[in-house]
Amino acid sequence: MTALLLALWPLFALIVAGYFLRLRAFPSAEFWPGAERINYFILFPALLFSSLATAPLDNPALPRLAGAVMLALGLAWIALLIAKRLRGWSAGRFGAITQGVLRFNTYLGLAAVGSLFGKEGLALAALMLALMVPTVNVMSVWALTAERGVSVRGLLLPIAKNPLILACVAGALVNLSGLGLPGGTDRLLSLLAAASLPLGLLCVGAALKPQELGGEIPALGWNSAVRLLAVPLLAYGVAMVLGLPDMETTILVLFFALPTAPTAYVLTRQLGGDSHLMAGIITLQTLLAAASLPLVLTLLNG
């Protein structure tokens, strides 16, 4: 427990620091959107690219982990569709709820995996992201637009333009080509990657909106409980059924125990979803994850 807390508390300290820096408008209100963009389009893709470019793609863990990811996401998606039919949610509300249950904070996830498992864990996590990011994006867009319909192009275009997915694909191709990262490229990418996670966590804190917590308390509460407790339990069940080893099980459960992504608010607003509910879900889940994530990982590892 002590080792786990030592690995996780600095990550949440950065999130809290980001919130208070934004609250004080330091260095300026305009800084944070720009910082988020440079991280999303340059620094974080550099981390994913370098992780996959040097990862052992012949690792027998990869097909096991891929199967576990898709099975867990598929089961959660089916449960959401059943709940939508029973509750009669509108597309805008269903889209926010879906993202609250399925999306995950990649910055926090990779930072936690890096603290717990180092480069080996980061390589596995990057490969998980290559599957999870496009799958969850398709589910999110469909959920937000289900009532008015959306073309295949409308579903796939955001995925094809996503810098995280492009970085994963490019890194895997470089790896398979055998070219490696010559001429100091590895050092350049390492420097960019080193800046990504701290800046990303500060931006997560800066994006929190506590004022949105005064709205739909029951919806915020049960959505957070499902995401932070029930979904990790589902992932653990899948890992047990498939017989995943300890490290793979921990990484799988960790990613399914993460709070939802701050970028879910942008997508919800762009596609006409319930952005107020989405903002509240993001904020409450991120705050509660400071307690739930150590709890889940402690129970998982005995």
Over which residues does each language-model region extend?
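Alpha-helical transmembrane segments of multi-pass small-molecule/ion transporters
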Residues: 1-302
